[in-house]
């Protein structure tokens, strides 16, 4: 699985990432509560996607771009 995340919007409290995998999707993160909302999971499992977002985006201080590769 290869997912590329790209920050597409950011406000004081919310970040939206677009993702590219076999089908594109979008996620939203509340910076204050760290709540993850899957706007469109594409073809990825939503629960696995939330885990990936927590580990790779939230814990890495919301990078502008990130590539996740498993395997």
Description of each model-found segment:
Residues 2-34:
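N-terminal acidic leader/helix
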Residues 26, 31-71:
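Acidic, low-complexity intrinsically disordered segments
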């Amino acid at each position: 699985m290869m997912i590329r995340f790209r920050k597409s919007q950011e406000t004081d409290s919310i970040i939206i990432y677009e993702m590219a995998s076999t089908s594109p999707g979008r996620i939203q993160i509340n910076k204050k509560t760290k709540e993850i909302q899957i706007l469109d999971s594409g073809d990825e499992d939503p629960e696995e996607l939330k885990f990936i977002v927590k580990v790779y985006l939230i814990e890495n201080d919301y990078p502008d771009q990130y590539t996740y590769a498993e395997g």
